[in-house]
Curated annotation (Swiss-Prot):
Membrane recorded as keyword: yes
Protein name per the record: Auxin-responsive protein SAUR27
Keyword Membrane: yes
Assembly and binders: Interacts with PP2C-D1.
GO CC annotations, alphabetized: plasma membrane
Miscellaneous: Exhibits a high natural sequence polymorphism between cultivars, thus conferring thermo-adaptation to environmental conditions.
Species in which this protein is naturally found: Arabidopsis thaliana
Length: 95
């Protein structure tokens, strides 16, 4: 089972394994779907749930809480930052 060490553009999966993944609207076990962007059109990414305990990712979550509180317009976790910032943060977490 190969680990994904970079962004797969077609699936937008950060970290973790692609084994057994099917295209669906729900996130596979061990992953969390987040919506990223500052415009109305946000990109959906799947990140490992372990990212939730990372201080860099928690900073992004704090920004989301400040902007949206607990009322997320996308119906899921929305992170209001530029995609390149999000990708920089997640790449630092991946090591």
């Amino acid at each position: 089972m190969a680990l994904v060490r970079s962004l797969f553009v077609s699936n937008k999966i950060l970290g973790g394994s692609l084994a057994g993944m099917r295209k669906s609207t729900s996130a596979p076990k061990g992953f969390l779907a987040v919506y990223v962007g500052e415009s109305q059109k946000k990109q959906r990414y799947l990140v490992l749930v372990s990212y939730l305990s990372q201080p860099l990712f928690q900073d992004l979550l704090s920004k989301s809480e400040e902007e949206f509180g607990f009322d997320h317009p996308m119906g899921g976790l929305t992170i209001p930052c530029p995609e390149d910032t999000f990708l920089t943060v997640t790449s630092r977490i991946q090591g």
